[in-house]
Amino acid sequence: MNKVFSDYGWEDYIQLQKEDKKIVKKINELIKDIDRNGYEGMGKPEPLKHGLTGYWSRRVTEKDRLIYKIEDDTIYIIGCI
């Protein structure tokens, strides 16, 4: 699948590369798992509600989440917060 970051998602990802390589490694593992398993797998995937209906989150750490959706053959990542 193709991976597309929103501007905010990319900023989050770049900032984390400067701050915590361990979290970036976990995000990369989650993205690979999303590529293989869609909306199932690691990180306790959960559908989001309200203004983010259609998006899902996965746990990166106890407080941080990867926010994404899948359309056609593309993973859209809007946040790594």
What are these regions (language model features)?
Residues 2-4, 8-25, 42, 49, ...:
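Enriched for short, Lys/Arg-rich terminal
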Residues 24-37:
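Compact soluble domain cores
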